[in-house]
Amino acid sequence: MSSDSRSLDHDTIAAIATPSGRGGVSIIRVSGPEALSIAELLTQKTLQARQPLLTRFFAEDNGVIDTGLTLFFQSPASFTGEDVAEFHCHGGVMVTNLLLEACLALGARLARPGEFSERAFLNNKMDLTQAEGLADLIDAPTQQAARQASASLQGAFSDAVNQLNQRIIDLRVYVEAAIDFPEEEVDFLSEGRVAASLLELKAALTTLISQARRGALLSRGAQIVMTGAPNAGKSSLMNQLANQAVAIVTDIPGTTRDVIKQTISIEGVAIQLSDTAGIRAATDAIEQEGIERAQAAVDTADIIIEVVDDREPKETVLYSSDNAQPLIRVLNKVDLSGRAPGVLNATDQEDESVPPSVAVSAVTGEGIQALEQVIIQCLGMGEAGTTSPFSARERHVTCLKRAEAALDEASDRFEVSQAGELLAEDLRRVHAELG
């Protein structure tokens, strides 16, 4: 059964389309085969598609609920692809609920969360990636995330995947043509076009994965955990990055017992910053619990910031992580140590293989801007906050990586065997992974 015919079996749904609470305007949306009849009964007017009309809204007892704007969108030229009616009333909580109840009394049922978008998907008004882009746009934590979610809603991500998929199909057709003409197959496959095309596809897929990773990061926000010895200045650093007093700062080691979280934005990237308990031999059960929570936070972080007192730079932090997250070493308290603030040059570091180090003062703010730039670079955003042209989800990254693995396998096998049949089958698998 096609998605279009499936949608015709749906009943008519209604819901409040605007946030709850008081406001200037509230919108009730109705979608389904009875949308027009409900709208005309509610307004006691004859409605024309795409012609806004100022109407009164009537209750079951024929009393007037409110006066507002009514719009009707005829299938398939609507958000859901079905007949849709919208009622724009004054934004009081009670009047909005009364208008919704009137719609339900006339035969609509209350929509499930996300059901309007679901119907739009089932009616081919948007694909799944666009539907997810819509959700990301609604939940966007920053301006940059909103821009990218809007791009995905307009089809930017879908177009990028579809274009890559078409190139894979074109190459497979070329290879299958060589198989159909066996006397020319060797010439077809050995002339270098196939090998060059495989390299180009691998490069394009690598770029797409990188963009999707950054898009996913912007959609969900980055998790950054600060760890270090007690009194290294983690709480002061958190307050400096958040530009407000989030964590309690004292000279007493072990003041922070629980994980303190604060959402900040650096160059349009939403970041949940976590200040954790200082790592040391615990003096009591409460401190031990704080240290264990710190370790749990480290294990799920996108970036770990190790904060050390620059007056004791040899001090090491005793934590472990099974993940390969980027690590940034922050040498704090340069206002006391005398070191120049900023990113350390390779010659300033004892070992070039160690993570990037940034000298800062969490008290004066010196070096904080340099630290923010290092954070952006470690998140893969590149210079000056370069980011993805679309939003994405972790599942998208996973699917793209599976396609990349299949393409790598196809390329390696072809390099060894030069067998067109195997390559065509491998390309079919890559195509399937991309969907």
Where are these regions (language model features)?
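Conserved nucleotide-binding/hydrolysis micro-motifs of P-loop NTPases
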Residues: 21, 32-34, 74-78, 92-94, ...
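Switch I (G2) and immediately adjacent beta-strands of P-loop GTPase domains
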Residues: 56-74, 254-282, 300-303
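Inter-motif core of Ras-like GTPase G domains
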Residues: 287-310
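Generic enzyme active-site microenvironment
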Residues: 273, 307, 330
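Conserved beta-strand segments of alpha/beta enzyme cores
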Residues: 109, 270-272, 356
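Short glycine-/polar-rich loops that comprise or flank the Walker A/P-loop
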Residues: 23, 50-53, 300-303, 324-327, ...
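A glycine-rich (often HGG/GG-containing) alpha/beta subdomain
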Residues: 1-147, 151, 155, 328
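C-terminal-of-GTPase-core extension/linker across diverse P-loop GTPases
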Residues: 2-20, 143-266, 282-284, 311-435
